Amino acid sequence: RFRPGPAWDQARPPAAQSGMAEHGANLGRLRREGRIQLGARYGDTGLVVFRAPDEAAVRAHLAADPTLSSGVFTAEIDAFAPFYHGSTRL
């Protein structure tokens, strides 16, 4: 989960936050490479479901995101083990 971090500027809209263009470009690259299964926003939280063999691989993907290294966002990693696939196959 991505959430606003200590460097989030409350006076600026999300698109104007520092590093957002690079953040979007990084997520776009990961999507094109097939490393992101699903992404969504709810409230001030962003959820990204990665296709990765382990947590270390997810951490490596996140390390390339400038909004995390700058503190604009924080990220939490949770294991995701679907038991019902519905219309989204993982």
Language-model segment annotations:
Residues 1-90:
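Conserved, structured core segments of small domains
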